[in-house]
Structure formats: C-alpha cells, structure tokens
Amino acid sequence: MYSNLQKTDKAVFDAVEKELGRQRTKLELIASENFTSLSVMEAQGSILTNKYAEGYPGKRYYGGCEFVDMVETLAIERAKQIFGAEHANVQPHSGAQANMAAYLALINPGDTVLGLNLSHGGHLTHGHPMNFSGKYFKIVPMNVRKEDEQIDYEEAAKLALEHKPKVIMAGASNYSRIFDWKKLREIADSVDAYLICDVAHYAGLIAAGVYSNPVPYADIVTTTTHKTLRGPRGGLILCKEKHAKAVNSSVFPGQQGGPLMHVIAAKAVCFGEALKPEFKEYQTQVVKNAKELSTQLQKLGYRIVSGGTDCHVLCVDLTSKSMTGKAAEEALDKAGITTNKNTIPYDTQKPFITSGVRLGTPAVTTRGMKEAEMAAIASFIDNVLNNADNEAKLAEISKEVTAFLGKFLLYTELN
C-alpha cells in the first residue's frame, strides 16, 4: 500500500511504519479511536483527492463532477438509510465543523444554548468558553446528578424554563448511559427550542440498533464518521427535510469551500459496511465488552462513574486510589496500554490532571476480542496502576501486553 511513499519520502514512510507498529503492539482503549477497514483507507487514498467539487451533486461550481456526484450521492443515500433520516449532508470535515454548521443553520451568535457540562461528560463544542460555541453563544450548562452521575432531566427542564434557550445541544464525549431523546424533545418543545443531538460517540451503536436513535426526535443530528462508525475522520449532519436548505447553506458556503471527495468516498464505504449484518454483530459485542470490562474493574475495587455503562465507553474514578488521571494515563502508556485522562463529574482536579481515566472497547473489539479478554485487560490495568512507579514492572507488563495482542492480528495485509 505504501510502496511509492517508501521510494519518494522515506521520512514520512518511516513515521507511518512506526505508527503501524504502535497500533499492532499497543492495547488501544481510547474510546474515540478505532481501526478502519483497508477499503475505507483505499477510498480515502484514491484519485478523488484530485477533484474540486464546490456545491452539491447536480449543482456544482466546477465541471467534471459527474463521478464524484455518484460517490457523494451514494454516501448521502446510505447515511439516510442507516439512520432513517430525511436529509443528510456528508461534507463536514469534522464533528466540530458539523456542530458549528448545525448551530448556525438554526440560530445566531448571541443566542442561548443549553448543553451538557464538559466536566460532566459533554464536549468542547457544546459550550466550553475556549471553543467557538462558548464564544459565539450564551451557554447554560446541563449537569448530571451527584448521587448517580446521570443526566438531571428535571434540572434541565427548570434551566430551560428559566433561560429560554434557542437550542438544546444533547450529546457527550464521556457519558456511558443512554440519552432520553424523547425527554429532551419535550424539554425543547416546552420553551420552543430546537434540539440538536451530537451522537459522535454513539453513531455506530445507533446504526446497529444497540443504542437509541435521536433522529425521530431531533431537528438536527450531528456525528463524526470515525469512532464507533469505524470510518474515516470526518463529520455528518442528519436533519428534517425542513432544515435541509439551511443546513446545506451553513456547510457550504457558510463554513467550508470544496468538499474532500476522497474522504466522502471513504464515508460511503464506511456507511456501506454499517449496512451489513456483521456490523450489528460487531456493535453488539462492543457493548458486551464494555459492560464486562466495567464489571471486571469493579471486582478489582475500581469505581466506575455512574456505576457502569450502557454503551462503548466507561470512566474509572481513581480518587480512592490516590492517583490522578494524568498519572494513570502515563503509567498505562509505558505498559503499552493507550487511554486518556478524563474529568469525572464534580472533579476537584484541573482538566489537564483529572481524577479519571476514560476507556472504550471499539478498537479491541475490531481486533476480535470478546468478554474473556476483558478480564485479562482489567488485570493488566490493575497491575499497572498498582505498580505505577515501578519502571521495570511496567516494562514487563508491556511485553505481556504485546504477547497478548499477538493473538489478535491487525492489518496483516500491510506486511
């Protein structure tokens, strides 16, 4: 796949080869990461990267777009079929740009948005002051309850009545329970607000029917196309037909110029894969693995935020272990286990330190792991965190992890 690159730019080739080695030999537990198929990568690396195609299928500002029109139309129709949506825009370059386009399709700068608090599981684009969302809009944060760390819909309803938001932004980057989209629709309707649902983390699960679908309730649904969807890095917007024109205009020319046709082709491939029966089997296993990993860690004495998980992600509270998320991430990385530090609800630590570490099962499930392997992974994690300051022990565990992964081969076609 990389023979020409090897000949023409050895520096870049070497970096790619080293990253391939890292992906093969490290235990990938970052909840937002996954391993795409070679078909997705081939589409993304195709000659479609050469084509400019400003506009939309049948309405381009450039000639010679008849074949990229075919590709984009395929992606659109497959996305609509997967999620049961009336309209799909496959052009956003990222989830963040999809969110910006969604906001500006419905509201104006200065309007009020009700979104989930970042430290309670939300996302930067749901109102963080350093993000465009926090700079352009007046943000009212939703929270989770202290007692069970699940979304406080009663408080959200009161906040909506008090602040009269124009948009309720529902979604998360670190929330392990199932959103009540119907309840959020009712809250939005009570104050005549729009409902945007960001399902970047849950899209693959939704596509397979193992997580609730917000499309029937939301005005607009946004997502990334990687993570659980296991496609290329990019964004996707789904909406009611009545919002289609505003959404399309907000993406182009509002936020972007020419679409990345090679990425859209890869999205089409990804959506095609999501329509196959084996994709549902995969997503079902992702959830089973996350639940089992949560159970095994709890048996070892770890507290899981909200008491467990209903999806692909879980967050471990390390407070009782007198360890920060930053320290845990660093120790795990030395042992060949890739994770990310994460705040927990009502965290007393700074965002770059944190009291938690976030774990996810999409990537390990892609490698073929099932419940039995989750017990081994929990044991690895426990061994690392109990020996975080022992460099020799961490090196020993790293070798054990590499040997463990030898049974779950990755990208053998690239040898």
Curated annotation (Swiss-Prot):
Biological process terms in GO annotation: glycine biosynthetic process from serine; tetrahydrofolate interconversion
Spans through the membrane: none
Entry EC number(s): 2.1.2.1
Compartment annotation: Cytoplasm
Enzyme type, top EC level: transferase
HAMAP family named among the record's database cross-references: SHMT
Summary of subunit composition and partner proteins: Homodimer.
Protein name: Serine hydroxymethyltransferase
Organism encoding this protein: Elusimicrobium minutum (strain Pei191)
